[in-house]
């Protein structure tokens, strides 16, 4: 077999020998180098994209946490206020006229919070005797807020002291006159007597879910993928999936970051096709260089 191959090579024309040598020592090595470059580039692009995306989705979670912390600070200034504490302690002992004065006082305190934060739709301060001291300017007068809240899943946990505060997922709301398409996130905090620890009621702050568009949507173009925010039970609260053309084409590469504070998850999906486009550009450049080198040889 070896002897036959040797005779075949010896009898081969010089042009053919040069062509085979050219293929073995120039064309094939360059093709292999090009393939290695493309594979390495693909891995580098994915790794760098993941690193950048991890930073960005962590920043989104940080922005969301910052907004929630601001709501918590404003709520704290309300439920620890001595005048409001006194109103809740004596809510069933004062005259009708005093009750109206109390409502005006609470209204002024809470409306300040509503004015300074544009995404707060309204607030409710409810006492244990069922009195609701404040809604917002779009309040409905034909409902009893305490009865509405009694149907909420968090009500018993707050009332029994199982949880001091609750941040709900997205829900529709019927407490407002303009709430036909209103979708809300609610921050709820139980109120206890500062001195005795006795439960006196709760504070509800309703937040327009569009706040998530402002906090997360501005990063959409920078990331080039679909951003989704899931609540602690992994229900979708916000997503850009229906807003981007070509989104979801191909197998997506998925990354996520869970907030220790809220339990919410920010998830990013980047279509694999987007990475392939980048590698394709590198492939064309590599191919051009190889063709040039072959022409030089």
Residue ranges of predicted features:
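Cytoplasm-proximal transmembrane signaling helix
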Residues: 272-297
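GAF sensory domains
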Residues: 135-143, 227-231, 235-255
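Extracellular/periplasmic ligand-binding regions of membrane signal-transduction receptors
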Residues: 69-105, 126-140
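A short beta-strand signature within small-molecule sensing/ligand-binding domains used
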Residues: 180-191, 245-257, 264-266
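N-terminal sensory and localization modules of signal-transduction and trafficking proteins
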Residues: 1-12, 51-52, 168
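Juxtamembrane extracytoplasmic/periplasmic/luminal helical "stalk" adjacent to the first N-terminal
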Residues: 14-92
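Solvent-exposed, extracytoplasmic
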Residues: 105-114, 195, 202-244
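Extracytoplasmic/periplasmic ligand-binding sensor regions of membrane-associated signaling proteins
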Residues: 116, 129-206
